[in-house]
Amino acid sequence: MALLSATAPAKTRFSLFSHEEAQHPHPHALSACCGGGASGKRQRARARVAAAMRPADAAASVAQAASPGGGGEGTRRPRVLVAGGGIGGLVLALAARRKGYEVTVFERDMSAVRGEGQYRGPIQIQSNALAALEAIDMSVAEEVMREGCVTGDRINGLVDGISGSWYIKFDTFTPAAERGLPVTRVISRMTLQQILARAVGDDAILNDSHVVDFIDDGNKVTAILEDGRKFEGDLLVGADGIWSKVRKVLFGQSEATYSEYTCYTGIADFVPPDIDTVGYRVFLGHKQYFVSSDVGAGKMQWYAFHKEPAGGTDPENGKNKRLLEIFNGWCDNVVDLINATDEEAILRRDIYDRPPTFNWGKGRVTLLGDSVHAMQPNLGQGGCMAIEDGYQLAVELEKSWQESAKSGTPMDIVSSLRRYEKERILRVSVIHGLARMAAIMATTYRPYLGVGLGPLSFLTKLRIPHPGRVGGRFFIKYGMPLMLSWVLGGNSTKLEGRPLSCRLSDKANDQLRRWFEDDDALEQAMGGEWYLLPTSSGDSQPIRLIRDEKKSLSIGSRSDPSNSTASLALPLPQISENHATITCKNKAFYVTDNGSEHGTWITDNEGRRYRVPPNFPVRFHPSDAIEFGSDKKAVFRVKVLSTLPYESARGGPQILQAA
């Protein structure tokens, strides 16, 4: 029976459901206040109605929990208390209820997701976590996958933050497909929590309740809330995050580890031109890095990490400005996303984790998710590990229950908790370490000798590849497939009752393999429109280049009378009358210098400037700068955009005919 302090004010529950429901106090709190009698009968009637509205297995759980004479562990499944209604806590509650357990989830504020929905934005649910959800409840997993945005069917990987060039590409599709697992998705944290809470059931979630202490007397656990209320159960699971109160009571005060990085995050209404071919990128830099990901609905989510002391703040409306200063000189993919994000949509938080521990619990209490293995977000596995935790804990509880039912002896809850911990510790510790390694690699990246060397920084002008960059690429190229295979598929053999099958909708583009091997093919598959944007503030208008192999663009000091509809006149001293020509072939653009006196120059995305040889077509790429006649007034930046942010560009001359 739950115990409620007579002096504590009654709390209401918060419903996440979209449909209207009659609100009633939590059943355990009612039993403490009202006892039996007419009120108790009304409560049992409400429980029967609620049971009828839930799936059969959940209804069986309520019926079994409400059965008379169920006071001992040998005659009923144990009552599970869960501190924390985040992703891990709700997944455990769902898994336990589907197996017939009575569950109570205590959450401070379901409507705010403990700030996660606001401060952490969408979450990546990778193949291993989606498979665990399928093993728990297929209908819930289907809803999560419908609501999510698939990213695992595209190119993902690491790129150089300055140039935007690919460093290494990740194949997250093949490891999933080979093991019959769902493909990685990104979903709003709020949406994910609402799906899980709806499946768990409103009657099992007690809102405005914060577990701050507990008493384990060896036979039961009493959870003590911040307002003084007390609830009894057979076990307590601390799923209350990195600053867990349950962890503190178990093992005493311990400090989280500051990663030395602060993180800015935002969501922008922005569609990059390669949205159909690239899911997410990690832009590498020295003591800073940037992550961008498609999250669906025409939005991009990004994270900007910068090495600095903890506790820093920004002046009012100063985040966007500071980010542009930090990432000054970085590639267009980064700068465009920052520029496209409203100031009020940018949030900041310091990044902490906790070192791996081999002691997750004591007695009838254990920990789950961030409360025991909070990790840095670099692998996108923090929430995934919590989902795996929830599944495994429910499995171990059920094993103990079945053993006790067969033997007719009381269920050994303590042993089941220790088995759960033993099953999870090694895998979680390895992935925790990989997340830390990923952060180190992302922030110690040096493309060239001289980067980060202070007085020797002039060496960067020589463009000598840094040995660490070369060695790192070799290691990642051959080590990453093995690592991804184990991270995404290493837990699949433990998923009971889940068939090894792929979803027909999780189909990758038939060019995916080619895109992994050929950067040019990936660029050619990019959507959007190509533009030449003038870098000076002169009279030149942005020029839209549209793919048509039958037409060409003439550049000269005056319009070409033989090509008047596709001619760019630049009346400048260093521009020859018939200076250069731009053509399109196989969805790529080329510039040919027509023997001009002052030449045509290209500065590529690596910062290398070279002269185009006369009468020979040279391919140019996004982010390149093309200089006609070595005149600063005739310099154009190549950009590819899905939507052009400049009104003047929309009205600019259309030079080439669309393909």
Swiss-Prot record:
One of its GO terms (cellular component) is chloroplast thylakoid membrane. It is found in: Plastid, Chloroplast membrane; Plastid, Chloroplast thylakoid membrane. Disruption phenotype: Accumulation of endogenous zeaxanthin and reduced level of ABA. Wilty phenotype, increased water loss and premature seed germination. It is a peripheral membrane protein. Induction: By cold in microspores. Disulfide bonds: none annotated. Residues 553-607 form the FHA domain. Its EC number is 1.14.15.21. Its cofactor is FAD. FAD binds at residues 79-107, 357-370. It holds the Pfam family FHA. Expressed in young microspores. Transmembrane segments: none annotated. One of its GO terms (molecular function) is zeaxanthin epoxidase activity. It catalyses: all-trans-zeaxanthin + 4 reduced [2Fe-2S]-[ferredoxin] + 2 O2 + 4 H(+) = all-trans-violaxanthin + 4 oxidized [2Fe-2S]-[ferredoxin] + 2 H2O. Zeaxanthin epoxidase that plays an important role in the xanthophyll cycle and abscisic acid (ABA) biosynthesis. Converts zeaxanthin into antheraxanthin and subsequently violaxanthin. Required for resistance to osmotic and drought stresses, seed development and dormancy. This is Zeaxanthin epoxidase, chloroplastic. It comes from Oryza sativa subsp. japonica. The gene is ZEP.
